[in-house]
């Protein structure tokens, strides 16, 4: 893997994690 693929993978993980936290926060969990 090169640095670009690693950066994209990290970005997707962080984005998904952030969206999950927002959804959980709004649903009251």
Swiss-Prot record:
Keywords: Chloroplast, Electron transport, Membrane, Photosynthesis, Plastid, Thylakoid, Transmembrane, Transmembrane helix, Transport. It is found in: Plastid, Chloroplast thylakoid membrane. This is Cytochrome b6-f complex subunit 8. Belongs to the PetN family. One of its GO terms (molecular function) is electron transporter, transferring electrons within cytochrome b6/f complex of photosystem II activity. One of its GO terms (biological process) is photosynthesis. InterPro entries: Cytochr_b6-f_cplx_su8_sf, Cytochrome_b6-f_cplx_su8. It comes from Huperzia lucidula (Shining clubmoss). The 4 large subunits of the cytochrome b6-f complex are cytochrome b6, subunit IV (17 kDa polypeptide, PetD), cytochrome f and the Rieske protein, while the 4 small subunits are PetG, PetL, PetM and PetN. The complex functions as a dimer. One of its GO terms (cellular component) is chloroplast thylakoid membrane. Component of the cytochrome b6-f complex, which mediates electron transfer between photosystem II (PSII) and photosystem I (PSI), cyclic electron flow around PSI, and state transitions. The chain crosses the membrane at residues 3-23. It is a single-pass membrane protein.
């Amino acid at each position: 893997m090169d640095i670009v693929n690693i950066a994209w993978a990290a970005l997707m993980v962080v984005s998904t994690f952030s969206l999950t936290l927002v959804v959980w926060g709004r649903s009251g969990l």
